[in-house]
Design a protein with these regions (language model features):
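Bacterial Sec-dependent N-terminal signal peptides
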Residues: 4-5, 16-49
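Repeated scaffold domains used in trafficking and secretory/extracellular systems
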Residues: 35-41, 85-94, 135-146, 179-188
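Short coil/turn segments that connect the beta-strands within blades of beta-propeller domains
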Residues: 45-47, 94-95, 149-150, 190-191
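Residue position within the beta-strands of beta-propeller blades
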Residues: 51, 99-100, 154, 195
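Short glycine/acidic-enriched loop and turn motifs that connect beta-strands
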Residues: 55-60, 103-108, 159-160, 199-204
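A short loop-to-beta-strand structural motif that recurs across blades of beta-propeller domains
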Residues: 66-69, 111-114, 160-163, 210-213
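A short beta-strand motif characteristic of beta-propeller blades
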Residues: 75-82, 122-136, 170-176, 220
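Solenoidal tandem-repeat scaffolds enriched in leucines and small polar residues
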Residues: 171-220
Length: 220
């Protein structure tokens, strides 16, 4: 299970990410008791924290859905939003939060994007926004997010990238990559889009890839 945490302050945003897997937890043999067993923030001068929980992915039994939990600065839970199968990324851009939900697999048609008001945590999209992935002929399986120039860029697990408008969340541009299992995405200081591909074109399993796609912001 993976969790991402946002701390919202009046003047700044701090982002922390942690992750764990059942494999890691199952193989823990002992705990060093000399190390602190709790984690604390340096101060409580932030307003809200948003915690993205990936959920649990299973072939069988069915996966447990992911969620976004909103806490106040006393770590009192204020709200929980169930987001679906495999919440994978959460970013803030401007006054909004964007959450990528991958869905179960490339043909499950249950992945998409949620948009929330960063200040209130209220949904700005009454339903998860879903996008067609021309490479698979199915609904897209979003993995990670980046933002620049009024657009949010989304990497698709099929090996494609899409940009959407931050006003109406409509598709702006789409590009199929010569790769599969695209994962991390960022915007460089050179105003280019960088995408890490964990599979190459003919790979049948994620993790076999060694390529990074470098693209213009126009994705052409």
């Amino acid at each position: 299970m993976k969790k991402s945490i946002f701390f919202l302050a009046a003047s700044a945003i701090m982002f922390a990410m942690g992750s764990c897997t059942n494999d890691v937890l199952d193989n823990v043999q002992q705990v060093d008791s000399s190390l602190p067993q709790t984690r604390a923030t340096a101060s409580n001068d932030w307003t809200y924290a948003y915690v993205l929980s990936e959920g649990t992915w299973h072939v069988a039994p069915p996966s447990s859905p992911g969620n976004i939990v909103r806490y106040d600065n006393n770590w009192t839970k204020k709200s929980t939003l169930e987001i679906g199968d495999t919440g994978n990324d959460l970013i803030q851009y401007g006054s909004k939060l964007y959450c990528a939900v991958s869905g179960h697999d490339l043909t499950a048609d249950n992945g998409g994007i949620w948009v929330l008001n960063a200040k209130t945590g209220q949904l700005l999209t009454p339903q998860m926004k879903q996008y067609d992935d021309e490479k698979t002929g199915h609904k897209a399986m979003p993995r990670h997010l980046a933002a620049a120039n009024g657009k949010v860029y989304i990497s698709f697990y099929s090996g494609a990238v899409m940009s959407i408008d931050t006003m109406n969340y409509a598709k702006v541009n789409y590009l199929e990559l010569d790769a599969t299992y695209s994962e991390g995405i960022c915007i460089g200081k050179d105003n280019k889009v960088y995408v890490c591909n964990s599979g190459n074109t003919d790979d049948t399993q994620a993790g076999e890839g060694t390529t990074i796609s470098v693209l213009p912001l126009t994705l052409d």
